[in-house]
């Protein structure tokens, strides 16, 4: 694909903070799309409640141990610096949610607003997302690949001023509210996917071969020079629309081997495999579950979900999850669907664990084979 064409990405604007950043690039967006819903979101996303949210009791301030409190304080200060949250005053019909921290891959903490209760007042529409199957259908022998990872993706979308009161939390006697889209909002994946559609349409109209999953882009082409040119154009286009590229997580220099959506694709061998860290994580979990006399049904269900997610890269992996699924089903039946009840692993499942313990290190798969399963 040539990066020349009638539509050239406009120049990037200088904007200091990431929160709600896309709103300052409205003019550039209006060049590539006339979708009024998308353009309205850029002015401020209005949460599409099916009924007006209410709380019988507000979420109380959570008490943390000193170490947790320090970590929470650091995370909230980072949100303030990014402009993602602001201190606010109480108002009628506000909605307060609890929150917690999760550790990111780099060891830093990410603040998560627990919007489980608020999400009951929202109903995200059904929509399709591109995934590993999309990649497997497009990829060809000896093609070169590059990836682009977007930084602070959800935070770039502004929330309309009339709806920030539903995204509030308390910490150390202060009241805060998100002014941009937080993690945990059930409609966020739909909004972000629809927001990216005009970009994909433009790229594909110019002949680019690309796949997108939320904040991750994969670009594919036949030659190194073509992919280098296409990648440069795509990066410039994304910058011009207000997106921030995460250089550390992106692979901007095209290669025949790259990681995308938690898998490693190799176009020379046309194989798909797992990164070392994911293999290691599964192996450790296998050993822990194997050595435990009993475990919660929930723990097995989570582990099963992880095993199923990696099966595209482990040949015959699906076959060695069936007995575990049966163990889970029988345990839930016995304990009246109580996922917190304890269970033991059957001898047949322990045999499957032995298979996984070996194949998690040696296994890979033909890129197209899993499409037939």
Set out the residue ranges of the language-model regions.
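Catalytic palm active-site di-aspartate
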Residues: 114, 149-151, 184, 205-224, ...
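Conserved, non-catalytic sequence blocks in retroelement Pol enzymes and Pol-derived host proteins
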Residues: 61-71, 85-93, 105, 121-127, ...
